[in-house]
From Swiss-Prot:
Enzyme class: transferase
GO molecular function: GTP binding; metal ion binding; molybdenum cofactor guanylyltransferase activity
Compartments where located: Cytoplasm
Domain comment (free text): The N-terminal domain determines nucleotide recognition and specific binding, while the C-terminal domain determines the specific binding to the target protein.
UniProt cross-references to Gene3D superfamilies, sorted A to Z: Spore Coat Polysaccharide Biosynthesis Protein SpsA, Chain A (3.90.550.10)
The protein's required cofactors: Mg(2+)
Residues in the signal sequence: none
Residues that hold GTP according to the record: L8, A9, G10, K20, D99
Primary location recorded for the protein, binned into one broad class: cytoplasm
Positions that bind Mg(2+): D99
The family this protein is said to belong to: Belongs to the MobA family.
Protein name: Probable molybdenum cofactor guanylyltransferase
Length: 194
């Protein structure tokens, strides 16, 4: 079974005030860290960004680049997923945000092993917390792509609502800490102090 990782590095980072993909944790930009971890779990790594030139010189490990079209209206991670899925040849795609500083190899490998056993009609496998699904660290079959377009055509961009319309397997979550992302300078500072 072939697994590809798709890392989204195209957000505007408005609340952070700087590019989250370039934030350094222990001297390593988050995008490099995320791609290194993804490469340990998946057979290939893809990075989706409207500005790949911004990041290409940072990465030494082999990755594939998807140059997302420049936004002409409201975008978001669901729009990026819909655009990228048909371009990647894999049985499953591990979708990752680029700003997951506590992402870890072992839990992702355990999830991959579970996902390999899922029935064909399961279209996504994602962890869930009391706030809802954690879609930016989840597994998706490429065949799910056609279900996204009707959702987007209604002006909807929310993962939670869309995921309610497809067959999703909940993945066990033993430690929520590695799902933490950073959206503001305060979040980033708190993470560095912990």
């Amino acid at each position: 079974m072939n697994f590809a990782a798709l890392i989204l590095a195209g957000g505007s980072s408005r609340r952070m005030g700087q590019d989250k993909a370039l934030l350094r944790l222990n001297g390593e930009p988050l995008l490099i860290r995320t791609s290194r971890i993804a490469a340990a779990v998946c057979d290939s790594v893809w990075i989706c960004s409207p500005e790949p030139d911004r990041y290409q010189s940072l990465l030494s490990q082999p990755v594939q680049w998807l140059t997302e079209p420049q936004p002409t209206g409201p975008q978001g991670p669901l729009t990026a997923l819909a655009w990228a899925l048909p371009q990647i040849d894999a049985d499953w795609i591990l979708l990752l945000a680029c700003d997951l500083p506590r992402l870890a190899i072992a839990p992702l490998q355990a999830w991959r092993q579970q996902v390999e056993l899922l029935p064909e009609d399961c279209r996504a496998a994602i962890a869930r917390t009391e706030q809802g699904w954690e879609p930016l660290i989840g597994f998706y079959r490429p065949a799910i792509a056609p279900t996204i377009a009707p959702w987007l055509s209604q002006g909807r961009r929310d993962f939670q609502g869309w995921l309610a319309t497809v067959a999703v397997q909940e993945l066990p979550l033993s430690d929520r800490d590695w799902l933490v992302n950073c959206n503001t300078p305060t979040d980033w500072q708190a993470l560095q102090l912990s």
